[in-house]
UniProtKB/Swiss-Prot annotation:
PANTHER family, per the entry: DNA REPAIR PROTEIN RAD51 HOMOLOG A (PTHR22942:SF69), RECA/RAD51/RADA DNA STRAND-PAIRING FAMILY MEMBER (PTHR22942)
Pfam families: HHH_5 (PF14520), Rad51 (PF08423)
Name the record gives this protein: DNA repair protein RAD51 homolog A
Keywords (A to Z) from UniProt: ATP-binding, DNA damage, DNA recombination, DNA repair, DNA-binding, Nucleotide-binding, Nucleus
Sequence segments annotated as region (Disordered): 1-21
Domain HhH: 49-78
Gene: RAD51A
């Protein structure tokens, strides 16, 4: 068999696997008796997959114009048949988790404490003070996620929401050169959007979902997830509204990770804690966003500065990773191991 025929066969097998395991296009609800017009209403409201419908609360479906209580119940029943949300055995879950892909960070030491790299299907939060390497740690996976699986990649595209205006395509070209990838192809495979306020940032997630149903994405970056909340909401009077808005945004991110299996990486800013000990040990930093941000993140990483371009990453919380530290370096070609 020729190499072209083998590639075609491999692509067909991958496509068949996606059909069997999802995400399922929302149009599949029509086969379960849902009218095409109602499917269009769901799609127009930002629900592009059957999974998205299955994860949506009934009261949210009722807010969609033209969806009555009877229709909502019928839609929920149809979605639950395609995407079962009941119990499964721990052995089945274990088998599914063995198939989870990790995207390399570019540093072997960092990959080691992450047990392979950035995990797909979950949210990884990176926080630290300015110049601690948060944005650089977002740029490198945008390239490495395009690598083949056997090279620590995800064989998919990247999506980047930039709230601070710090995204630099030329850095991606330098990183692509390091990994032997075509620079033009790498840039073409990164979808970029600048977010200007918290509402716009949330709307971009709806657009992201429609893009992910069309093509394979392996990574989604939001840099920073909290920057706009610090400016759009001010004072204690708006604290409750800020936290509610942030909780909905983070929940939408988790839904994208669940629906499409993408690795979601978000950066977070910090605030200095000034107390009596700061006089002797220097100011201590804590991430903003409170408990809502802490609970939304699957894996939480803290960055701090070392000597020169050296940075230290510490695993703060994770359901399966040990609390550990790794040293890495900020280089022109992205995140790399420290050269002793």
């Amino acid at each position: 068999m020729s190499s072209a025929a083998q590639q075609q066969q491999k692509a067909a097998a991958a496509e068949q696997e996606e059909v069997e395991h999802g995400p399922f296009p929302i149009e599949q609800l029509q086969a379960s008796g849902i009218a095409a017009l109602d499917v269009k209403k769901l799609k127009d409201s930002g629900l592009h997959t059957v999974e998205a419908v299955a994860y949506t609360p009934r009261k949210d479906l009722l807010q969609i114009k033209g969806i009555s209580e009877a229709k909502a119940d019928k839609i929920i029943e149809a979605a639950s048949k395609i995407v079962p949300l009941g119990f499964t055995s721990a052995s089945q879950l274990h088998a599914q988790r063995l198939e989870i892909i990790q995207v390399t960070t570019g540093s072997r030491e960092l990959d080691k404490i992450l047990e392979g790299g950035i995990e797909t299907g979950s949210i990884t939060e990176i926080y630290g003070e300015f110049r601690s390497g948060k944005t650089q740690l977002c740029h490198t996976p945008c390239v490495t996620c395009q690598l083949p699986l056997d090279q620590g990649g995800g064989e998919g595209k990247a999506l980047y929401i930039d709230a601070e205006g710090t995204f630099r395509p030329q850095r991606l070209l330098q990183i692509a050169d390091r990994f032997g990838l075509n620079g033009a192809d790498v840039l073409e495979n990164v979808a970029y959007a600048r977010a200007y306020n918290t509402d716009h940032q949330s709307r971009l997630l709806l657009e992201a979902a429609s893009m992910m149903i069309e093509t394979r994405f392996a990574l989604m970056v939001v840099d920073s997830a909290t920057a706009l909340y610090r400016t759009d909401f001010s004072g204690r009077g708006e604290l409750s509204a800020r936290q509610m808005h942030m909780a909905k945004f983070l929940r939408s991110l988790q839904k994208l990770a669940d629906e499409f299996g993408v690795a979601v990486v978000i950066t977070n800013q910090v605030v200095a804690q000034v107390d009596g000990s700061a006089m002797f040990a220097g100011p201590q930093f804590k991430p903003i966003g409170g408990n809502i941000m802490a609970h939304a993140s699957t894996t939480r990483l803290a960055l701090r500065k070392g000597r020169g371009e050296e940075r230290i990453c510490k695993v703060i919380s994770s359901p399966c990773l040990a609390e550990a530290e790794a040293r890495f370096q900020l280089a022109s070609e992205g995140i790399a191991d420290v050269k002793d």
